[in-house]
Amino acid sequence: MRILIVVPQQDHASGNWVTARRFQQGLEKLGHRVIILEITLQGEASFQGKVIDFAPDVALLLHAYRSGKPWLENARDLMIPAVVMLTGTDVNHGLDDPQQSGIIQAVIEQAVCVMLQNPIIANALSRNRPTLATGLKTVPPGVILGHEIFDLRATLGVAQELPLFLMPAGVRPVKGAIGLLKIFDQLAAKGDSFHLAFCGPLLDEDYGRRFRAEIETRPWASYIGVIPPEAMAAAMRSADVIINNSISEGLANSLLEAATLGIPILARNNPGNAALVRHDVNGLLYDDDNSCLRQATRLLKKEYRLQLSRPERSYNPDMEAKTLEAILTEAVNHQPKAQIIASSG
């Protein structure tokens, strides 16, 4: 098959791009021709021409609103069967946003099938919006670890014995970076020794400016910018704990990698994170700021962190690719009704 993957225009270290590249790699390994095209929400005049030049058998849209809206406006009349992957942003925010919900529903209606990256979110969607959730299936997510070298502690100037917390995420309000700094203020006030590092692209200009100003006032915290996806595994191996403080989440690639590597996870308890973090097994979940502080304090102890170091081997990229292949083949054969496909976490 000739497969087109459409992603929103973002930094190439973003989760959408990491997922798109993994899909591309897995599907090409199975013998398919796959290209990735990015598009802005407004669309570009050249986009339709690029699609026509590639002549795909099927399109995979990553992000129902940010990829689906310009697809409807620029490529709908090309009659290419489309598969849509709903993100956490689509489900947790877009469907409740009057400006987005109608467009997301239109994208779902025109799609041959729709994927979700989390079975917990899929079940919630089925309960709350049954008209959007018929014929649920599971697509097991995969992980491909990069092999580039990255010495995180040397970059930060942090001693080997100092507990190092790492939060990999795009810097925008929903990810809660500033809130996490304020929680860790209380840990620092107790006199505990640690370092808190952030990495990821600045995706919101105003929030990013405030975040960097907050970092400057805390000697125990650092922002190191973007770590290339191919080097993220090496960076994580240098950390003691991986943090996710997102208010809402779909299925974070950073947590998939952390779970695969056996790095203990500290994560806000939401459906996206709960699908990956088994509390007191491979990490700790928290419900509020006080709970986060308590769990972070527990993770300062090396002996306890070792108990949570349990590498997860089930995130097989070959299985993910084969399942995607089956879905896309079905789309080419053009099932008349949209089907919701939920990938497991």
Protein language model features and the residues they cover:
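Short hydrophobic beta-strand element within catalytic cores of glycosyltransferases
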Residues: P264-A267
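A short, active-site helix/loop in glycosyltransferases that binds the activated sugar's phosphate group
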Residues: E109-H147
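A charged, aromatic-enriched C-terminal amphipathic alpha-helix characteristic of glycosyltransferases
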Residues: S14-V18, K301-H334
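Glycosyltransferase donor-sugar binding loop
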Residues: L41, P168, H195-R209, G225
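Aromatic "clamp/platform" in nucleotide-sugar-dependent glycosyltransferases that forms part
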Residues: I247
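Nucleotide-activated donor-binding/catalytic signature segment of Leloir-type glycosyltransferases, i.e.
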Residues: R209-I227
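Conserved donor-binding/catalytic core segment of Leloir-type glycosyltransferases
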Residues: V158-K175, L181-F184, A197-C199
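Short alpha-helical donor nucleotide-sugar binding micro-motif in glycosyltransferases
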Residues: V226-I227, A234-A239
